[in-house]
């Protein structure tokens, strides 16, 4: 696997994982655009590991608060960190159940086609813009209810469609429910932690089944991808948090329209 291809994969994973433009769509398309074989489970594991580390480092104060809050919950006390942990947990059941069923019945790849990606990329652009344009900004993570968290979790199911974007659908739902722009992005990325960890675990299981290596990837390849994914993901999160506060989600909606149209012309 060439160094250039590894760099492209790492940049795509890191930049798009937390932006509302679908990392899975870009990662699925990268091998086809560059004429390479699928990157295989080792690269998937390391790319997810780099992205996961980036969000943990960027939101380290939240992570520490959640960790301390969980200890307090065990002692019967509810702290802001403990409540945040419960909110994230309340958003998880739908994706765990449905994604688990897809994995169990080997249906994960059923929708992985350029046509589906193109349509989903276009279809979810307008809701993102509408929710941001007309959604109130009256609710913060500190004031959101468990009902809000559950509804955002249900919306996350659309992320199982390649091209929909996990961060995109959760941020859209959060803005539609009235969360502020920054807290919509923040809660979406905190929700990403267990999701990325779970999908990384699935890729790790595939890696073990593949007897260690796949698609010509080596451990050094994986380390390159992990390192670059970490750096680019951290930078992407920083840019996203500043951008949504100042401008909103319109640039991402416009990007989705452009990408979707390009995919339709190029692949369909």
UniProtKB/Swiss-Prot annotation:
Entry's EC annotation: 3.6.1.27
Cellular localisation: Cell inner membrane
First-tier enzyme category under EC: hydrolase
Keywords, sorted A to Z: Antibiotic resistance, Cell inner membrane, Cell membrane, Cell shape, Cell wall biogenesis/degradation, Hydrolase, Membrane, Peptidoglycan synthesis, Transmembrane, Transmembrane helix
PANTHER family in UniProt: UNDECAPRENYL-DIPHOSPHATASE
Entry GO MF terms: undecaprenyl-diphosphatase activity
Protein's organism: Maricaulis maris (strain MCS10) (Caulobacter maris)
Main subcellular location: membrane
UniProt gene name: uppP
Protein name stated in the entry: Undecaprenyl-diphosphatase
Chemical reaction(s) catalysed: di-trans,octa-cis-undecaprenyl diphosphate + H2O = di-trans,octa-cis-undecaprenyl phosphate + phosphate + H(+)
Family matches, as InterPro entries: UppP
Pfam families for the chain: BacA
Family to which the UniProt record says this protein belongs: Belongs to the UppP family.
Parts of the chain that traverse the membrane: 1-21, 39-59, 85-105, 110-130, 144-164, 187-207, 221-241, 247-267
Membrane topology, from the record: Multi-pass membrane protein
Function: Catalyzes the dephosphorylation of undecaprenyl diphosphate (UPP). Confers resistance to bacitracin.
């Amino acid at each position: 696997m060439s160094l250039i291809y590894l760099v492209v994969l790492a940049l795509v994973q890191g930049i798009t994982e937390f932006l509302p433009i679908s990392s899975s769509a870009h990662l699925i398309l990268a091998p086809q655009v560059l004429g390479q074989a699928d990157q295989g489970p080792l690269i998937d594991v390391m790319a997810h590991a780099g992205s996961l580390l980036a969000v943990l480092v960027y939101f380290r104060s939240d992570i520490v608060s959640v960790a301390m809050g969980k200890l307090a919950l065990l002692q019967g006390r509810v702290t802001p960190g403990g409540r945040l942990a419960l909110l994230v947990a309340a958003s998880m059941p739908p994706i765990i159940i449905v994604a688990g069923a897809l994995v169990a019945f080997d249906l994960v790849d059923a929708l992985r086609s350029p046509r589906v990606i193109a349509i989903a990329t276009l279809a979810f652009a307008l809701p993102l813009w509408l929710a941001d344009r007309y959604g109130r900004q009256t609710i913060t993570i500190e004031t959101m209810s468990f009902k809000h968290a559950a509804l955002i979790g249900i919306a996350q199911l659309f992320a199982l469609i390649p091209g929909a974007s996990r961060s995109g659908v959760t941020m859209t739902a959060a803005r539609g429910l009235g969360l502020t722009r920054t807290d919509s992005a923040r809660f979406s990325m905190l929700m990403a932690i267990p999701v990325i960890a779970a999908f990384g675990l699935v890729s790790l299981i595939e890696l073990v089944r593949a007897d260690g290596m796949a698609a010509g990837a080596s451990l050094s390849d994986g380390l390159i991808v992990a390192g670059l994914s970490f750096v680019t993901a951290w930078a992407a999160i920083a840019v996203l948090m500043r951008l949504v506060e100042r401008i909103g989600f319109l640039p991402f909606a416009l990007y989705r329209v452009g990408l979707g149209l390009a995919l339709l012309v190029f692949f369909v």
